Amino acid sequence: MVGFLRALTAASAVPAAAAVAAVALSTNSSSSSRLRLPSPASLPSLSSAYAAAPASGSARKPNAVPPMAAAAATADLSAAADKGAALPELMTEFMVDMKCDGCVTAVKNKFQTLEGIKNIEVDLNNQVVRVLGSLPVNTMLDTLHQTGRDARLIGQGNPNDFLVSAAVAEFKGPVIFGVVRLAQVNMELAIVEATFSGLSPGKHGWSINEFGDLTRGAESTGKVYNPSDYRSNKPLGDLGTLEAGEKGEAQFSASKEKLKVVDLIGRSIALYATEDRSDPGIAAAVIARSAGVGENYKKLCTCDGVTIWESS
């Protein structure tokens, strides 16, 4: 009898053990398949695939950037400026002094010879040329002037996607003159373009600073702008260096990750005599909102009667 009970117990234990083994095997298989999923480190970085993020001021906060990734973004800005790397595609709008269909053809033909131009639209009635491409603004303006026609930048970016898609800071002398343009490409990326004259030859540090207070020039603009959720060994507003040639002129074109144009309005851009920004600063200008595409078809300034072609 005892032998019979032992045999019965052993026989019933076999299916149970098999069931436990099956469950364990299923669990291990599931764990194994989860482990085979790509880790975050193997996914494309923001520098190679610009993922859309919620607009500034929305309920969701943008994910914090790992220190190394943010540092790389800052390094990429300087590298792009030094090597003349192509900028991201952006819609840019110009007002061009066109009077006939021949003008339209001349403008289109000129742009079609350039690399980095994806599409061009010409509105003869409004004298407007819209260019989708990755060339700096100055290059496109020079191209328009080469057709023998006056041209003015009137808009950048896409105001349908952003509350503020473009901004500008103007340096009006008496020694240093220049303009800095900022345009939002997407919520993770902005373009910074600058042209300066009147600088001493050599390298100059420059940055986006916290305040737009110019009562004491660059000295009263505060620290380098750095939002609280930005993690890097360098502040987000650090724009690296400008290198002025023998004539005191400098140009800069690069993209910068995590920079949101809407958050920069009312702050300032400051220039320094030294590369490390150890001096009080030599010039500064307030960052102001600039027109987006389709927002500025005005040809006459109502305040002084100056036409767009007469303005500097």
Curated annotation (Swiss-Prot):
A GO molecular function held by the record: superoxide dismutase copper chaperone activity
Pfam family, any one: Sod_Cu
Principal location listed in the UniProt entry: plastid
UniProt transit peptide range: 1-78
Organism this protein belongs to: Oryza sativa subsp. japonica
Cofactor(s) required for function per UniProt: Cu(2+)
Family: In the C-terminal section; belongs to the Cu-Zn superoxide dismutase family.
Purpose: Copper chaperone for superoxide dismutases (SODs). Binds copper ions and delivers them specifically to SODs. Is required for assistance in SODs disulfide bond formation and thereby activation of SODs.
Residues where Cu cation 2 binds: 301, 303
Record text on cofactor binding: Binds 2 copper ions per subunit.
Protein name from the UniProt record: Copper chaperone for superoxide dismutase, chloroplastic
Highest taxon of the lineage: Eukaryota
Annotated positions binding Cu cation 1: 100, 103
Keywords on record: Chaperone, Chloroplast, Copper, Metal-binding, Plastid, Transit peptide
Alphabetized InterPro entries for the sequence: HMA_dom (IPR006121), HMA_dom_sf (IPR036163), SOD-like_Cu/Zn_dom_sf (IPR036423), SOD_Cu/Zn_/chaperone (IPR024134), SOD_Cu_Zn_dom (IPR001424)
